[in-house]
Amino acid sequence: MTEATRILLGVNIDHVATLRQARGTRYPDPVKAALDAEEAGADGITVHLREDRRHIQERDVRVLKEVLQTRMNFEMGVTEEMLAFAEEIRPAHSCLVPERREELTTEGGLDVAGQEQRIRDAVRRLAAVGSEVSLFIDPDPRQIEASARVGAPAIELHTGRYADAEDPEEQARELQRVREGVALGRSLGLIVNAGHGLHYHNVEPVAAIDGINELNIGHAIVAHALFVGFRQAVAEMKALMLAAATKR
């Protein structure tokens, strides 16, 4: 595998915790899912500790920090509570995301351009404890350029509009936006990741984009795991991504 065809898979295990929290039980354990994902080829584990604690809990994050063999990508809102927690646990990677209590999942990208100083301060605090920071943003040139200005080393492009496109023409337009976003981010020296809404039937065109470093995928893998098991679900997704990346 050459550097050009290398692509990483970050497995988001939030929805394993969603199933647990639905009944207030101790199972299924997202930590076990994370370890299974690593054994199946995941390059990292993503968790989002939301303000309302609807799925992942602080204990999950603390245990994962101690047991992961790969790395944790800690998704977090830009709040003092989350910044203080991240400074305590020192995740290898952290991703700043927008967050609203009423949303089912993260609905759009972070408005970096509209709050540059606030984001710059958060990036500095996280970098000071050794965490590589990415910003979850729409594939919008204004937001990509702002991300570079605030000092973030990485961005994660929101692929939700591509994933939700209702016809082939719209999907093609949104895929082109992602392609252009990747190219711009790379030209500015940013590491470019992507994710949101990706599944087994739409991941390949995104994985084939030259310059994408990593895809973060969760819901589709957790859903597929109900039928084939967690390790198999992760392995199938990784295989699709690697096959697509060879076409770059």
UniProtKB/Swiss-Prot annotation:
One of its GO terms (cellular component) is cytosol. 1-deoxy-D-xylulose 5-phosphate binds at residues 14-15, 50, 55, 105. It is an enzyme of class 2 (transferase). It catalyses: 3-amino-2-oxopropyl phosphate + 1-deoxy-D-xylulose 5-phosphate = pyridoxine 5'-phosphate + phosphate + 2 H2O + H(+). The gene is pdxJ. Transmembrane segments: none annotated. One of its GO terms (molecular function) is pyridoxine 5'-phosphate synthase activity. This is Pyridoxine 5'-phosphate synthase. GO terms for biological process: pyridoxine biosynthetic process. Belongs to the PNP synthase family. It comes from Pseudomonas aeruginosa (strain UCBPP-PA14). Pathway: Cofactor biosynthesis; pyridoxine 5'-phosphate biosynthesis; pyridoxine 5'-phosphate from D-erythrose 4-phosphate: step 5/5. It is found in: Cytoplasm. Homooctamer; tetramer of dimers. 3-amino-2-oxopropyl phosphate binds at residues 12, 23, 197, 218-219. Its EC number is 2.6.99.2.
